[in-house]
């Protein structure tokens, strides 16, 4: 877990032909959602420089709390305080 930046991990998932982006989702900090988090399939995001996009919504990478496989294995997790 946690090898490289979240952007590097997402780029590998999206662009490495050995990976299937349909097998992954991200959990982001999203105020107003249940538990203040939101789950987004990696297949729905586009990577940018300091942000990623879900449709036309721009979201900073620092909002990502976890990158998780469908089987529940966490492949990247934020070092934010208090994250369980």
Curated annotation (Swiss-Prot):
Where does the source fall among the domains of life?
Answer: Archaea
Q: Which family does it belong to?
A: Belongs to the UPF0248 family.
Q: Which residues cross the membrane?
A: none
HAMAP family in the record, alphabetically?
A: UPF0248
Name this protein carries in UniProt: UPF0248 protein PF1300
Enumerate the InterPro entries for this protein: MJ1316, UPF0248
């Amino acid at each position: 877990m946690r090898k490289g930046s979240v952007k590097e991990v997402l780029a590998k998932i999206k662009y490495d032909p050995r990976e299937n982006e349909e097998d992954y989702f991200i959990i982001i900090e999203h105020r107003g959602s249940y538990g203040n988090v939101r789950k987004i399939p990696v297949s729905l995001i586009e990577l940018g420089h300091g942000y990623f996009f879900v449709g036309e919504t721009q979201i900073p990478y620092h909002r990502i709390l976890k990158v998780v496989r469908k089987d529940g294995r966490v492949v990247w997790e934020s070092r934010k305080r208090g994250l369980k």
